[in-house]
Amino acid sequence: MDVEQKQGAATSGNPLRDLSNYGQSPWLDFIQRSYTADGSLKKLVDEDGLRGVTSNPAIFEKAMGYGTDYDAQIKDLLAHEILSPGELYEKLAITDIKATAKVMHPVFVQTKGLDGYVSLEVSPYLAFDTKGTADEARRLWDAVGEENLMIKIPGTPEGVPAFQEVTSQGISVNVTLLFSLEAYKNVLEAYIKGLEIRHAAGEDISKIASVASFFVSRIDGKIDGAIDRRVKEGDKDAEALKALRGKVAIANAKVAYQHYLEVTASERWKKLAAAGANPQRLLWASTGTKDKTFSDVLYVEELIGADTVNTIPPATFDAFRDHGKLRASLTENVEDAYKVLDQQAKLGLDLDGVTKTLVTEGCASFCDAFDQLLGAVANKQATFLGSKLIEQKADLPADLKAAADAVLEDWRKTGKGRKLWAKDASVWTGGDEGKWLKWLDIVDDRLAHVSELEAFASEVKAKGFSDVLLLGMGGSSLGPEVIAETFGQIAGFPKLHVLDSTDPQQVKTFENAVDLKNTLFIVSSKSGGTLEPNILKAYFFAAAEKALGSAPGKHFVAVTDPGSHMEDVAKKDGFWKIFYGEKQIGGRFSVLSNFGLVPAAAAGLNVRAFLESALRSVKESSASTPPAQNPAMQLGAILGAAATKFGRDKVTIIASPAIYDLGAWLEQLLAESTGKKGTGLIPIDDETLGAPGVYGKDRVFAYLRLKGEACPNQEKAIAALIAAGEPVVTIDLADKLDIAQAFFHWEYATAVAGSVLEIDPFDQPDVEFSKIETKKLTTAFNETGKLPPETPFATSGVFEFFADDANAKALGHGDALAILKAHFGRVKAGDYVGVLAYIERDLKTREWIQNVRLNLRDQLKVATAAEFGPRFLHSTGQAYKGGPDSGVFLQITADDHADLAVPGERFTFGIVKAAQARGDFDVLSERGRRALRVHIKGPLEAGLAELATVIKKAV
């Protein structure tokens, strides 16, 4: 450009408009919907010669987070889509960018693509991710679809190759966050290489534009701050230092411009220019004056030159219009600029170090601003969604709140939430955790295939089944049980039953509860090798065959992982359908996969609505949701901090009666995920609330409340606990379908808590040990026809007592009262008592175990777990063996008054249950746990009544 000729052009009297006479384009560093809509932006174009617009997260945060400009669009979007805060922000931002681009398009046409651009920034979270930056740049470019768009990419070492790549693909880019000459040189080189690659491929390069955003005032902010400190301290070079105030940033910019002039004069560039290439102009950014002792237009007046852009904040824009002075300042006193840079180096002001620091701080600042922006959007979103989201409220002691907040701030600063979604194992132990995170994606995946489940539901209904009997254990059964207990029998569909026991009486009870001729059996086993579902399948397959008088395969469905033994069995036996799980989802995280959805669909649950409810929690917990707006992350932080900092590791689950069974599912999730390596969260489910005085200082209460169906007694008790200073997290569900949200909410929270506990929440190393011991015993039975003999260390009436040598020695050889008194006498503050009953789980035995546990709690002032075996082996058993050594266990076994054969096996259900109990106890003993087994001889009901009486006396 012939600057001298331009400078001779007529002046308008408006310094902003007249910048073009010097070859400089004024852009506005500001965007706001109302500003564009009311014509204010167009007025700047018409009256001030505005040539472009830049945006950044801080600008959008101010625009979107406050006022009502965006409310109508937010309401409309949320009425039609389930979005994460990041997705919602992007849709809002793209609307703004497109509207702004249309206002600026006449400038784009008039200047033949030199100006008229509006910039949209890639996520600052990707500043150090080359592939992520390039992918997002392409995605945003396509999403906006305006030719006068520039994608903003940071000039970090990782951002520069992404910039080169997308330039070669025809995308116009604003490279931002440049402070040093070296960084600028790398960016300009990348631009030229990108053009050369595209040109060599025979592609048009004339429609690509780029600017290099060179930040100015932030440099003086750092340098001048250092100067002022040294002068105040009496530095010997005080006068020389003071002479550099307000000069280093401008000198740095002038030297960068000299490099631009050299490159654009080179033969290499001229070849590209001849092919239609546009030069990458320098754009002066951060040009608002922060030091009030300087002119408020300093960084505009001193940086005027040909082929440059100055993106100006609104206040500075107005100030320059009012009193800006024009001259070709960028090429003035260039030698002095070099001298200034030499002088700062001699004086030890370390411009190189300052620019490196500014890049680091700039990336962090952009991330902070993006956090605030997404937080503001998330707050708006939560307001408009209201009760469509489950609501969480934490009443915490001040010290626990501070500890949880510290965890959340760490997650925010380090981006652990984004790392979690990226399946980065460094969030936990750096092991193979990343291989077990498909549960993060399963809701979207199942929604994409929900028509298959809906078709299955229609077929089940059409076949007229009266019952669905699911045969499974642990993660394959507990989620479906929640669905069965919460929704009951749905009109027009079969009743869902869930059997997860080897107790022969319980198996028989379930057999009697269904019409074998008219029942759909769902055999659910991820691995296909789990003992219980395999023998249950064998039993009911034979029973159904007998009832039907023919091969019953068409009454059976399998849910299993691809390639499993169960898949082979299902094919061999002619099962009606096989539904597949996802190998990279552990059982306890599988409820929103086919393991939960297939039985739900068979029972008539609206699986589409169920999954859509779950999706709300997925989006609320997304990678784009800051910790302050992420309730599931907050829950995980609270649980983790409570356990690690305050010894509050007993997570006491209270649920409204209508959703009571959520606690049973949560037990497995928490215990198996966290109870290992001597630490963990010990879930306490279904323990009726007591007065505050019966609790120790080791509890965190999780209150799952169904709005409109809250229990008055629970409400009163929870209020008393809060008043007493106990930590209570209340989670409100507006509708029963929202248990789907609760499922994901707790899965995510558990993953976060696992990180705080510094364990792998996706393995279960101690579950296998009980299986191994059980296998030894059943193998011995198959070989000899009997289990290996065992001898009680004491007998008292109908009770036989068993223990390893260490426990037996500690308990003595007295009567039942003395032994139980000694056993429970070992309980101390911070412990919990586990009552582990290998008996039929029915209304009577559940009432019995509740009465026993509450007596133990109230007398010993410790948490209590009331479990039925072998069900709990696939649930809380992991924590009892691998978690903290704070459990005192009473295992209860009993004579079976009747037994059931297992088709194809020598052992019976009763033998399997006995082997499981003994295997479980052997592992508890091997781990040095305080454990006692009492075996009841004779009638069970009478024996239980007597045991309850003795326990009451013992404590």
Regions found by a protein language model. Give the residues of each.
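Flexible, acidic glycine-rich loops studded with aromatic residues
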Residues: 277-381
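Catalytic alpha/beta core domains of metabolic enzymes, predominantly
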Residues: 163, 171-315
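Extended, charge-enriched "interface" segments that sit outside catalytic cores
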Residues: 386-462, 708, 716-717, 753-756, ...
